[in-house]
UniProtKB/Swiss-Prot annotation:
Phylogenetic lineage: Bacteria, Pseudomonadati, Aquificota, Aquificia, Aquificales
TM helices/strands, residue ranges: 1-21, 62-82, 88-108, 119-139, 149-169, 174-194, 196-216
Protein family (similarity comment): Belongs to the ATPase A chain family.
GO biological process terms on file: proton motive force-driven plasma membrane ATP synthesis
Keyword list, A-Z: ATP synthesis, Cell inner membrane, Cell membrane, CF(0), Hydrogen ion transport, Ion transport, Membrane, Transmembrane, Transmembrane helix, Transport
Name by which UniProt lists this protein: ATP synthase subunit a
Organism: Aquifex aeolicus (strain VF5)
Annotated HAMAP family: ATP_synth_a_bact
Chief location of this protein within or outside the cell: membrane
Quaternary context: F-type ATPases have 2 components, CF(1) - the catalytic core - and CF(0) - the membrane proton channel. CF(1) has five subunits: alpha(3), beta(3), gamma(1), delta(1), epsilon(1). CF(0) has three main subunits: a(1), b(2) and c(9-12). The alpha and beta chains form an alternating ring which encloses part of the gamma chain. CF(1) is attached to CF(0) by a central stalk formed by the gamma and epsilon chains, while a peripheral stalk is formed by the delta and b chains.
Pfam family, one: ATP-synt_A
Cellular component terms (Gene Ontology): plasma membrane; proton-transporting ATP synthase complex
Membrane association type: Multi-pass membrane protein
Length: 216
């Protein structure tokens, strides 16, 4: 299906919402979903405190939502017959552009036109040069952010597909395939967590840089 990534992206959103609803449901006895959600939100909160400071706490919902979407999007690729929406460049680029426009919006909102000083560099005479370099650097951010996630998820999906195909075509590989398959799945899960973290931390770093106030 040409737009299958949209369907899987919506499914990832649905899974994230279900997780939040189950984890946020009041209960006298804390459930595993509550523990997971609270631990995750604490992790996001600490990430923002370390990189942005106290005023960064208002970004907890955004970063938490991004992390959940990327995580569940990645996880869908582990389900037989399913496709990870994050293995499609269009999904990742849309998410990266959301981060890109949002942190620039926050930069102007926090600093006004003084935000442009972030692009000028420390030497006034070199400001035009630094401005061009910074603009190119910022334009490259959503591209690299989306490509990194796409490449890792696509490569993992192709590797799993190749291993399954080998087992189907050659029954003799059944002797060693379980061990190899378990190893590959373990590596894939590790990659899922790492890539989710990278997308989140880079989003936080971009926001932190944008809302930082120029010292006078």
């Amino acid at each position: 299906m040409e737009y299958s990534h949209v369907v899987y992206a919506l499914l990832a959103v649905a899974l994230a919402i279900i997780f939040v609803l189950k984890g946020g449901k009041p209960s006298l006895k804390p459930t595993k979903y509550q523990a997971l959600l609270e631990g995750y939100l604490r992790f996001v909160r600490n990430m923002l405190l370390e990189n942005v400071g106290e005023r960064g706490l208002k970004y907890v919902p955004l970063i938490a939502a991004i992390g959940l979407f990327v995580f569940f999007g990645n996880i869908l690729g582990m389900v037989p017959g399913f496709e990870a929406p994050t293995a499609n460049i269009n999904t990742n680029l849309a998410l990266a552009l959301l981060v890109f426009f949002y942190y620039h919006f926050e930069g102007f909102r926090e600093n006004g036109l003084a935000y442009l000083k972030h692009f000028m560099g420390p030497i006034p005479l070199m400001a035009p040069f630094f401005f061009v370099v910074e603009v190119i650097s910022h334009i490259a951010r959503p591209i690299t952010l989306s490509l990194r996630l796409f490449a890792n998820m696509k490569a993992g999906a192709l590797l799993l597909l190749t291993l399954v195909s080998l087992v189907i075509k050659n029954p003799f590989t059944l002797v060693v395939s379980p061990v190899v398959l378990i190893f590959v799945i373990a590596i894939k899960f590790l990659a899922i967590f790492i890539q989710t973290y990278i997308f989140m931390i880079l989003s936080v770093v971009y926001i932190a840089g944008a809302v930082a106030h120029e010292e006078h």
